[in-house]
């Protein structure tokens, strides 16, 4: 029964909220893991899910070695899902609302090594694929694009005349 609500929620995120494929995948994976845990504990309806079930699941995942960052993302998925069920009138309270997220250390991205950047910029491509790969690496390095943003670029997004490209960022923002 919970699975049909999960599918509805994922469709809502895709169609109404316009979430990226990666985000949809992560939400679905997190919610499916929770559903398996709940089913094993004979909890089959959303109304039966209590705060202690969410805490128990998170603690189980922590003991399995999941990182605080992953646990935080999972809790965020659960809170969003239960808020959706609240809005749909299926639940009266969000069982994940009071579950505290684990503390995560904020880490800055690692800068590329100077020698590696020099090698990249000095590299002379020999064929079409190497020319393409060097152009992609230089674009990513010089503009700070995410890998997913680079992979989603189309030829129509690039203007050689204006020396610019149009990028759909995280959350499909331009």
Which role fits each region the language model picked out?
Residues 1-174:
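Conserved catalytic core of the tyrosine transesterase superfamily
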């Amino acid at each position: 029964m919970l699975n049909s609500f999960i599918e509805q929620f994922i469709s809502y995120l895709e169609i109404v909220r316009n979430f990226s494929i990666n985000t949809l995948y992560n939400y679905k994976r997190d919610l499916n893991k929770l559903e398996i845990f709940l089913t094993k504990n004979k909890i089959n309806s959303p109304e039966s899910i209590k705060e202690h079930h969410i805490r128990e699941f998170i603690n189980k995942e922590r003991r399995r070695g999941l990182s605080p960052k992953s646990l935080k993302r999972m809790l965020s998925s659960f809170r969003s899902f239960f808020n959706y069920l609240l809005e749909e009138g299926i639940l009266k309270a969000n069982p994940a609302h009071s579950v505290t997220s684990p503390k995560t250390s904020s880490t800055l991205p690692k800068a590329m090594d100077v020698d590696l950047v020099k090698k990249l910029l000095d590299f002379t491509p020999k064929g079409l694929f190497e020319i393409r790969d060097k152009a992609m690496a230089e674009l990513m390095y010089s503009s700070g694009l995410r890998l997913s943003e680079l992979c989603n670029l189309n030829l129509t997004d690039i203007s050689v005349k204006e020396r610019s490209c149009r990028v759909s960022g995280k959350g499909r923002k331009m």
